[in-house]
Design a protein with these regions (language model features):
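Asparagine-centered strand-capping/turn motif at beta-strand->loop junctions
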Residues: 29-36
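Intrinsically disordered, low-complexity Pro/Gly/Ser/Thr-rich segments with frequent PxxP/GP/PP motifs
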Residues: 45-92, 100-104
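Short beta-strand elements
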Residues: 105-138
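Cysteine-centered nucleophilic/redox motifs
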Residues: 217-232
């Protein structure tokens, strides 16, 4: 229907870290009736083709002539299937589908917006959402345990106490020694500096998870820093 106009503010690329931290895919939706006739009993729907988990649906009792409705609340209900990202090793392009129907199920307006799903190890929007890097601090990976055991051995040699008791000792110097032991354990891994893992994206980067990092023994600056955080 040519009298309907939709404006969407959304993320053109979606990553697992964004999903896990409840960053909404769609931030704002404007629906305008540019015609001279009011529309009643409408249903607005947003979904992601092939990889959507929960669509966004909204009942609209009345959309007046030349009226614009502004949607921001509950848009976070639109989400992807997380397994769709966990199974990806490369970017997958799909579409965000918007549909507006009347009470009879007749489609009054339909529009497609391009969107992409990125691999789970991809860090997006480092410049605008740097806090998302914290999602890659994964202290429960099994690959962490051998590094901590080595650090504990070093800590015991230095202090006769190999326990990682954090601030329970109430001794700032002990905390420093714990961090030094962790750092020394990572140094012993003899990591080779390696540039960013291969990717075709224009922004963001892949981040090697700790199992890959300590197996391949290659890492860049962000990966080494995230490893220190994982072990802290």
């Amino acid at each position: 229907m040519g009298n309907l106009k939709c404006e969407l503010t959304y993320l053109p690329e979606v990553s697992y870290a964004l999903y896990q931290n409840y960053v909404p895919i769609v931030r704002e939706l404007l629906l305008t009736n540019e015609g001279n006739t009011a529309l009643e009993n409408l249903e607005l729907s947003l979904s992601i083709d092939s990889f959507g988990r929960f669509p966004y649906q909204q009942k609209i009792a009345l959309l007046g002539a030349h009226e614009t409705l502004h949607f921001t609340d509950d848009l976070h209900t639109l989400s992807i299937d997380p397994t769709a990202i966990l199974q990806r090793t490369e970017r997958v392009d799909t579409v965000l589908r918007l549909t507006l129907q009347d009470a009879t199920g007749t489609t009054l307006h339909s529009e497609l917006f391009p969107i992409a799903l990125l691999p789970f190890d991809y860090a997006l929007q480092i410049d605008t959402l740097p806090e998302m890097l914290a999602a890659f601090v994964t202290p429960n990976y099994p690959a962490i345990a051998p590094i901590l055991q080595r650090a504990s051995h070093t800590l015991f040699q230095w202090t006769n106490n190999g326990s990682f008791d954090g601030y329970q000792s109430e001794d700032p110097n002990r905390v420093r020694k714990m961090m030094a032991a962790v750092y020394y354990a990572i140094v012993q891994e003899q990591l080779i500096y390696s540039a960013l893992p291969p990717s075709y994206e224009k922004c963001g980067q892949r981040i090697r998870m700790c199992d890959t990092l300590f197996t391949q023994r290659m890492a860049n600056c962000i990966e080494i820093k995230s490893s220190l955080c994982r072990l802290s």
